[in-house]
Amino acid sequence: MKLSRKAKRYDDSVLPGEFQGFEVFHRVDAELEGTLEGFLRRSQDGVQLGEVVLERHAPKKLSFAKLKNKAEALSEQVNYLKERLEIVDHDRRGMYIQLRSLPPYKDDTQIQFNEISIGKNKIVVKRIAFYRKEEVKQQVPLQLSERELERLLFDIRQAIA
């Protein structure tokens, strides 16, 4: 997925999260001709999702207008996370759109938000925290119920289909 210069600079400044104890998953989706992979940890409180990547291996013809429509539809569909999603960045030539929580979660020490990056053949879902004191951005787990996880996987699959 080709990122805009702004998004690339931003992504380069996000530190990887500490996801020890998370299980890696990898599924082949024959119908979609793609793969679903990521890492998560299940507990009594639900699921902590480190990251999920859905990639379609058979390229699909897609205009930027259609990609934007899919991103807008996804932002409306994914209404079960703690914050609503809005388009914050896009790149017409690179066929890339970034959704983010607006407004994000804030407290005295940090700001956290969900981020979904949508490309022509790839979708990445993750949660990022900005720690004010250290001025550091780091990937953190996204807390979901099992039902929310299944719905999220269904919704991103529909967006890339």
Language-model-derived ranges and their functions:
Residues Y10, G17, A71, P103-K106, ...:
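Residue-level detector of solvent-exposed, low-hydrophobicity positions
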Residues T35-L40, I111-V125, L152-L153:
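Short, structured motif recognition centered on aromatic/hydrophobic residues
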